[in-house]
Regions:
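Anion-binding alpha/beta catalytic cores of soluble intermediary-metabolism enzymes, centered on
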Residues: 1-45, 52-242, 247-311
Length: 311
Protein backbone atom coordinates (compact mmCIF):
# COMPACT_ATOMS: atom_id res chain seq x y z
CA UNK A 1 0.00 0.00 0.00
CA UNK A 2 1.40 3.40 -0.98
CA UNK A 3 1.73 6.29 1.47
CA UNK A 4 -1.20 8.07 -0.19
CA UNK A 5 -3.32 4.92 0.09
CA UNK A 6 -2.38 4.59 3.76
CA UNK A 7 -3.42 8.19 4.39
CA UNK A 8 -6.77 7.62 2.73
CA UNK A 9 -7.40 4.40 4.62
CA UNK A 10 -6.57 6.10 7.92
CA UNK A 11 -8.86 9.03 7.15
CA UNK A 12 -11.69 6.66 6.23
CA UNK A 13 -11.61 5.14 9.71
CA UNK A 14 -12.83 8.44 11.18
CA UNK A 15 -14.26 10.57 8.36
CA UNK A 16 -13.92 14.29 9.04
CA UNK A 17 -15.84 17.29 7.74
CA UNK A 18 -13.49 19.00 5.29
CA UNK A 19 -14.37 22.19 3.42
CA UNK A 20 -13.30 22.26 -0.23
CA UNK A 21 -13.33 25.96 -1.01
CA UNK A 22 -13.26 25.87 -4.82
CA UNK A 23 -16.20 23.73 -5.88
CA UNK A 24 -16.50 25.54 -9.19
CA UNK A 25 -13.30 23.85 -10.38
CA UNK A 26 -14.03 20.47 -12.03
CA UNK A 27 -11.07 18.82 -10.25
CA UNK A 28 -12.40 19.88 -6.85
CA UNK A 29 -15.94 18.77 -7.72
CA UNK A 30 -14.69 15.34 -8.81
CA UNK A 31 -12.48 15.04 -5.71
CA UNK A 32 -15.49 15.84 -3.51
CA UNK A 33 -17.53 13.14 -5.22
CA UNK A 34 -14.82 10.53 -4.74
CA UNK A 35 -14.15 11.56 -1.13
CA UNK A 36 -17.82 11.02 -0.35
CA UNK A 37 -18.16 7.80 -2.38
CA UNK A 38 -15.04 6.26 -0.80
CA UNK A 39 -15.98 7.62 2.65
CA UNK A 40 -12.55 9.19 3.09
CA UNK A 41 -14.07 12.44 4.36
CA UNK A 42 -17.34 14.32 4.59
CA UNK A 43 -16.81 17.03 1.96
CA UNK A 44 -18.40 20.44 2.41
CA UNK A 45 -18.18 22.07 -1.00
CA UNK A 46 -18.13 25.85 -1.35
CA UNK A 47 -18.78 27.25 -4.81
CA UNK A 48 -20.05 25.61 -7.97
CA UNK A 49 -23.03 23.42 -7.14
CA UNK A 50 -22.16 23.66 -3.45
CA UNK A 51 -22.56 26.40 -0.86
CA UNK A 52 -22.88 30.02 -1.94
CA UNK A 53 -21.35 31.99 0.96
CA UNK A 54 -23.49 35.04 0.17
CA UNK A 55 -26.65 32.99 0.78
CA UNK A 56 -25.45 30.83 3.66
CA UNK A 57 -26.97 31.56 7.10
CA UNK A 58 -23.50 31.29 8.68
CA UNK A 59 -22.15 34.23 6.67
CA UNK A 60 -22.83 36.75 9.43
CA UNK A 61 -20.99 34.59 11.97
CA UNK A 62 -17.98 34.33 9.70
CA UNK A 63 -18.09 38.09 9.12
CA UNK A 64 -18.22 38.76 12.86
CA UNK A 65 -15.28 36.42 13.39
CA UNK A 66 -13.18 38.21 10.78
CA UNK A 67 -14.01 41.61 12.23
CA UNK A 68 -13.21 40.52 15.78
CA UNK A 69 -9.91 38.94 14.80
CA UNK A 70 -8.70 41.85 12.68
CA UNK A 71 -10.43 45.07 13.77
CA UNK A 72 -7.55 47.02 12.25
CA UNK A 73 -8.39 45.64 8.79
CA UNK A 74 -12.20 45.74 8.79
CA UNK A 75 -13.89 49.15 8.95
CA UNK A 76 -17.48 48.05 9.52
CA UNK A 77 -19.97 45.20 9.31
CA UNK A 78 -20.66 45.77 5.63
CA UNK A 79 -17.01 45.33 4.74
CA UNK A 80 -16.83 42.26 6.98
CA UNK A 81 -19.74 40.66 5.14
CA UNK A 82 -18.09 41.40 1.81
CA UNK A 83 -14.80 39.83 2.96
CA UNK A 84 -16.62 36.78 4.33
CA UNK A 85 -18.17 36.00 0.94
CA UNK A 86 -14.71 35.13 -0.39
CA UNK A 87 -14.83 31.32 -0.61
CA UNK A 88 -11.42 30.75 0.95
CA UNK A 89 -12.07 33.10 3.88
CA UNK A 90 -15.52 31.56 4.29
CA UNK A 91 -14.01 28.06 4.36
CA UNK A 92 -11.44 29.11 6.96
CA UNK A 93 -14.21 30.75 8.97
CA UNK A 94 -16.25 27.53 9.04
CA UNK A 95 -13.24 25.70 10.46
CA UNK A 96 -12.59 28.40 13.06
CA UNK A 97 -16.25 28.31 14.15
CA UNK A 98 -16.24 24.53 14.51
CA UNK A 99 -18.64 24.05 11.59
CA UNK A 100 -15.97 21.94 9.89
CA UNK A 101 -12.89 20.04 11.01
CA UNK A 102 -10.49 21.19 8.28
CA UNK A 103 -10.32 23.04 4.97
CA UNK A 104 -8.45 22.76 1.68
CA UNK A 105 -7.99 25.50 -0.93
CA UNK A 106 -5.51 26.59 -3.57
CA UNK A 107 -6.68 24.86 -6.75
CA UNK A 108 -7.58 28.26 -8.19
CA UNK A 109 -6.26 30.67 -5.53
CA UNK A 110 -2.66 31.60 -4.78
CA UNK A 111 -0.79 30.23 -1.79
CA UNK A 112 -0.56 33.77 -0.41
CA UNK A 113 -4.35 34.12 -0.47
CA UNK A 114 -4.85 30.79 1.30
CA UNK A 115 -2.24 31.70 3.93
CA UNK A 116 -3.87 35.07 4.63
CA UNK A 117 -7.29 33.46 5.02
CA UNK A 118 -5.96 30.77 7.35
CA UNK A 119 -4.05 33.19 9.56
CA UNK A 120 -6.90 35.69 9.64
CA UNK A 121 -9.72 33.29 10.52
CA UNK A 122 -7.95 30.41 12.29
CA UNK A 123 -4.61 31.69 13.57
CA UNK A 124 -1.60 29.80 14.83
CA UNK A 125 -1.56 27.18 17.57
CA UNK A 126 -0.06 27.85 21.00
CA UNK A 127 3.71 27.57 20.80
CA UNK A 128 3.68 28.07 17.03
CA UNK A 129 3.85 31.69 15.93
CA UNK A 130 4.91 30.78 12.39
CA UNK A 131 2.76 29.12 9.74
CA UNK A 132 4.92 26.88 7.57
CA UNK A 133 4.54 23.88 5.28
CA UNK A 134 5.87 20.43 4.53
CA UNK A 135 5.84 17.95 1.70
CA UNK A 136 5.81 14.23 2.34
CA UNK A 137 8.05 12.63 -0.26
CA UNK A 138 7.26 8.96 -0.90
CA UNK A 139 10.37 7.49 -2.54
CA UNK A 140 10.42 4.49 -4.89
CA UNK A 141 12.30 2.47 -2.24
CA UNK A 142 9.38 2.81 0.18
CA UNK A 143 10.79 5.53 2.43
CA UNK A 144 8.71 8.60 3.26
CA UNK A 145 10.69 11.76 4.01
CA UNK A 146 9.34 15.04 5.36
CA UNK A 147 10.71 18.14 3.58
CA UNK A 148 10.19 21.49 5.32
CA UNK A 149 9.65 24.38 4.60
CA UNK A 150 9.04 24.22 0.86
CA UNK A 151 6.21 26.70 0.26
CA UNK A 152 5.74 29.45 2.85
CA UNK A 153 8.58 31.07 4.84
CA UNK A 154 11.15 32.57 2.47
CA UNK A 155 14.04 33.23 4.85
CA UNK A 156 13.29 31.97 8.35
CA UNK A 157 15.19 33.18 11.39
CA UNK A 158 16.94 30.55 13.51
CA UNK A 159 14.03 30.56 15.98
CA UNK A 160 11.50 30.24 13.17
CA UNK A 161 13.51 27.40 11.64
CA UNK A 162 13.48 25.57 14.97
CA UNK A 163 9.71 25.94 15.30
CA UNK A 164 9.17 24.90 11.68
CA UNK A 165 11.16 21.75 12.45
CA UNK A 166 9.11 21.10 15.58
CA UNK A 167 5.82 21.46 13.69
CA UNK A 168 7.09 19.07 11.01
CA UNK A 169 8.22 16.53 13.58
CA UNK A 170 4.87 16.65 15.38
CA UNK A 171 2.90 16.25 12.16
CA UNK A 172 5.11 13.39 11.02
CA UNK A 173 4.19 11.50 14.19
CA UNK A 174 0.51 12.02 13.33
CA UNK A 175 0.71 11.22 9.63
CA UNK A 176 3.44 8.60 9.30
CA UNK A 177 3.45 7.21 12.81
CA UNK A 178 7.19 6.74 13.26
CA UNK A 179 9.72 8.56 15.43
CA UNK A 180 10.96 11.77 13.78
CA UNK A 181 14.69 12.10 13.20
CA UNK A 182 15.38 15.71 12.33
CA UNK A 183 18.30 16.93 10.21
CA UNK A 184 18.98 20.66 9.83
CA UNK A 185 20.54 20.84 6.37
CA UNK A 186 23.34 23.06 5.13
CA UNK A 187 26.23 23.09 2.68
CA UNK A 188 28.39 22.37 5.74
CA UNK A 189 28.67 19.37 8.05
CA UNK A 190 29.85 20.08 11.57
CA UNK A 191 32.04 23.03 10.74
CA UNK A 192 33.38 21.89 7.37
CA UNK A 193 32.47 25.34 6.01
CA UNK A 194 31.33 28.66 7.38
CA UNK A 195 29.06 31.57 6.58
CA UNK A 196 25.88 33.31 7.74
CA UNK A 197 23.62 30.51 6.50
CA UNK A 198 25.67 27.89 8.33
CA UNK A 199 25.57 29.96 11.51
CA UNK A 200 21.79 30.23 11.20
CA UNK A 201 21.40 26.47 10.91
CA UNK A 202 23.65 25.84 13.93
CA UNK A 203 21.68 28.28 16.08
CA UNK A 204 18.40 26.76 14.87
CA UNK A 205 19.58 23.28 15.82
CA UNK A 206 20.41 24.38 19.35
CA UNK A 207 17.08 26.19 19.64
CA UNK A 208 15.28 23.04 18.53
CA UNK A 209 17.09 20.94 21.13
CA UNK A 210 15.87 23.37 23.78
CA UNK A 211 12.30 23.23 22.45
CA UNK A 212 12.15 19.45 22.02
CA UNK A 213 15.02 17.65 23.75
CA UNK A 214 13.13 14.36 23.42
CA UNK A 215 13.28 14.42 19.59
CA UNK A 216 16.46 13.23 17.90
CA UNK A 217 18.03 16.05 15.89
CA UNK A 218 21.36 17.18 14.50
CA UNK A 219 22.81 19.99 12.44
CA UNK A 220 24.38 21.38 10.55
CA UNK A 221 24.47 18.42 8.17
CA UNK A 222 24.89 18.11 4.43
CA UNK A 223 22.29 16.07 2.60
CA UNK A 224 24.54 13.04 2.15
CA UNK A 225 25.48 12.96 5.84
CA UNK A 226 21.79 13.11 6.74
CA UNK A 227 20.72 10.30 4.41
CA UNK A 228 23.67 7.96 3.74
CA UNK A 229 24.99 5.97 6.70
CA UNK A 230 28.44 5.40 5.18
CA UNK A 231 28.88 9.13 4.58
CA UNK A 232 27.59 9.99 8.04
CA UNK A 233 30.19 7.69 9.62
CA UNK A 234 32.93 9.74 7.97
CA UNK A 235 31.48 13.24 8.14
CA UNK A 236 29.42 13.14 11.33
CA UNK A 237 30.46 10.19 13.50
CA UNK A 238 28.16 9.73 16.46
CA UNK A 239 25.35 11.79 14.95
CA UNK A 240 21.99 10.72 16.42
CA UNK A 241 20.33 11.05 13.00
CA UNK A 242 23.20 10.72 10.54
CA UNK A 243 22.29 8.45 7.64
CA UNK A 244 18.76 7.93 8.92
CA UNK A 245 17.08 11.34 8.99
CA UNK A 246 13.41 11.41 8.00
CA UNK A 247 12.63 15.10 8.59
CA UNK A 248 14.80 17.33 6.41
CA UNK A 249 14.80 20.99 7.46
CA UNK A 250 15.99 23.33 4.71
CA UNK A 251 17.63 26.65 5.57
CA UNK A 252 15.37 28.70 3.32
CA UNK A 253 12.54 28.48 0.82
CA UNK A 254 14.85 28.42 -2.20
CA UNK A 255 16.55 25.26 -0.97
CA UNK A 256 13.34 23.52 0.13
CA UNK A 257 11.29 24.26 -2.95
CA UNK A 258 14.07 23.35 -5.37
CA UNK A 259 14.86 20.14 -3.48
CA UNK A 260 11.34 18.75 -3.39
CA UNK A 261 10.78 19.40 -7.10
CA UNK A 262 14.11 17.80 -8.04
CA UNK A 263 13.37 14.71 -5.96
CA UNK A 264 9.85 14.53 -7.40
CA UNK A 265 10.86 14.80 -11.04
CA UNK A 266 14.31 13.20 -11.11
CA UNK A 267 13.98 10.49 -8.46
CA UNK A 268 10.37 9.57 -9.20
CA UNK A 269 9.12 10.45 -5.72
CA UNK A 270 5.47 11.14 -5.04
CA UNK A 271 5.01 14.51 -3.33
CA UNK A 272 2.08 14.85 -0.92
CA UNK A 273 1.43 18.44 0.10
CA UNK A 274 2.03 21.22 0.74
CA UNK A 275 0.63 20.62 4.21
CA UNK A 276 0.32 23.71 6.39
CA UNK A 277 1.86 23.40 9.85
CA UNK A 278 1.40 25.42 13.02
CA UNK A 279 -2.27 26.39 12.68
CA UNK A 280 -4.76 26.16 15.53
CA UNK A 281 -7.04 24.05 13.30
CA UNK A 282 -6.13 22.26 10.07
CA UNK A 283 -6.26 24.05 6.73
CA UNK A 284 -3.97 23.50 3.81
CA UNK A 285 -2.97 24.63 0.37
CA UNK A 286 -2.97 22.96 -3.03
CA UNK A 287 -0.79 23.48 -6.03
CA UNK A 288 -2.80 25.17 -8.76
CA UNK A 289 -1.64 22.28 -10.93
CA UNK A 290 -3.07 19.72 -8.48
CA UNK A 291 -4.74 16.62 -9.88
CA UNK A 292 -7.91 15.08 -8.47
CA UNK A 293 -5.76 12.50 -6.68
CA UNK A 294 -3.58 15.27 -5.21
CA UNK A 295 -6.67 17.00 -3.81
CA UNK A 296 -7.90 13.75 -2.28
CA UNK A 297 -4.50 13.08 -0.68
CA UNK A 298 -4.20 16.56 0.84
CA UNK A 299 -7.77 16.24 2.13
CA UNK A 300 -6.82 12.95 3.80
CA UNK A 301 -3.79 14.68 5.35
CA UNK A 302 -5.77 17.52 6.92
CA UNK A 303 -8.36 14.99 8.08
CA UNK A 304 -5.59 13.06 9.82
CA UNK A 305 -4.38 16.29 11.43
CA UNK A 306 -7.91 16.95 12.68
CA UNK A 307 -8.28 13.45 14.08
CA UNK A 308 -4.92 13.64 15.87
CA UNK A 309 -5.83 17.03 17.34
CA UNK A 310 -9.21 15.72 18.47
CA UNK A 311 -11.04 18.51 16.64
Amino acid sequence: MSFAEELRARAARTPRRVVLAEGGDPRVAEAARRLADEKIAIPIVVGGAGIDPAKDPRLSRVATLLRERRPDRVRDGIEALDLATDPVRFAAGLVALGEADAAVAGATHTTAHVIRAALWAIGTAPGHDTLSSAFYMALPDGRVLTFTDCAVVADPTPEQLARIALAAAEDRCRLVGDAPRVAFLSYSTRGSAGGPSVDKVRVATEAFRTLAPEILADGELQGDAALAAAVAERKAPGSPVGGQANVLVFPDLDAGNIAYKLVQYLAGASAAGPLFQGLLRPMSDLSRGASVDDIITVTAMVAAQATAAGS
